[in-house]
UniProtKB/Swiss-Prot annotation:
Binding site residues for ATP: 38-45
Membrane topology qualifier: Peripheral membrane protein
GO biological process, one term: transmembrane transport
Upper lineage: Bacteria, Bacillati, Bacillota, Bacilli, Bacillales
UniProt-recorded name of the protein: Uncharacterized ABC transporter ATP-binding protein YknY
Assembly description: Part of a complex composed of YknX, YknY and YknZ. The complex interacts with YknW.
Organism from which the protein derives: Bacillus subtilis (strain 168)
Main location class: membrane
EC number: 7.6.2.-
């Protein structure tokens, strides 16, 4: 489903060029549950941004579901994001003036889905993540775990093939983090491909494959980790 081939990423700042990714090769198949780990500045978030069509590789190719999108323009990338990818972020990214249900409706507005269908699908998504009784609550009336569940509902409401989660438990306590990871595991069991970025080994251990990134390269996992990805 995801194929990065010889992907490099560099940034030009003034006269200096900074290489962030070096010849990344990564395959992730439909239905996999993969974590990307690495220290701060390793390049893991850059890989996530490229997979999520939020950034482009400087060179190399990126195929998503058999479609080479390496050279897509901004408008084309936005269409791919809205059609195929759901996002979950550490800080939830909920609009504070909209209730839970209306926050979940947002991706469908961008997709041009009618009001009645939007409402029905948002309700089903919130029920799926256990928030049937919180649909009309504002974000400031929800706990951290509930906010993240709203974010997950928003990510799945368009039925994407792929969910990308960037440090999804980073702002949560241990018990709430476990509940959120259970939610991802359940979604993956239904066939959704999930890729998450984390620096927490206990979170990565919930996934089926661990991709280790260091200094812009994919490297073998340490002996204490049960899986690696390339």
């Amino acid at each position: 489903m995801i194929q990065l081939s010889n992907v490099r990423k560099s940034y030009q700042i003034g006269k200096e060029t900074f290489d962030v990714l070096h010849s990344i090769d990564l395959d992730i198949h439909q239905g996999e549950y993969v974590s990307i780990m690495g220290p701060s500045g390793s390049g893991k978030s850059t890989i996530m941004n490229i997979i999520g069509c939020l950034d482009r590789p400087t060179s190399g190719t990126y195929q998503l579901d058999g479609e080479d999108i390496s050279s897509y323009k901004d408008k084309e990338l936005a269409a791919v994001r809205n059609r195929s990818i759901g996002f979950v972020f550490q800080q939830f990214q909920l609009l504070p003036r909209l209730n839970a249900k209306k926050n979940v409706e947002l991706p469908m507005i961008y997709s041009g889905i009618g009001k009645k269908e939007r409402q029905e699908r948002a309700e089903r998504a919130l029920e799926k993540v256990g928030l049937a009784d919180r649909m009309l609550h504002m974000p400031n009336e929800l706990s951290g775990g509930q906010k993240q569940r709203v974010a997950i509902a928003r990510a799945i409401v368009n039925e994407p093939k792929l969910i990308l989660a960037d440090e999804p438990t980073g702002a949560l306590d241990t018990k709430t983090s476990e509940a959120i990871m259970d939610q991802f595991t359940a979604l993956n069991a239904e066939g959704t491909t999930i890729v998450l970025v984390t620096h927490e080994p206990e979170v990565a251990d919930c996934t089926n494959r661990i991709v280790m990134v260091r200094d812009g390269n994919i490297v073998p996992a340490s002996s204490g980790q049960r899986s690696v990805g390339e």
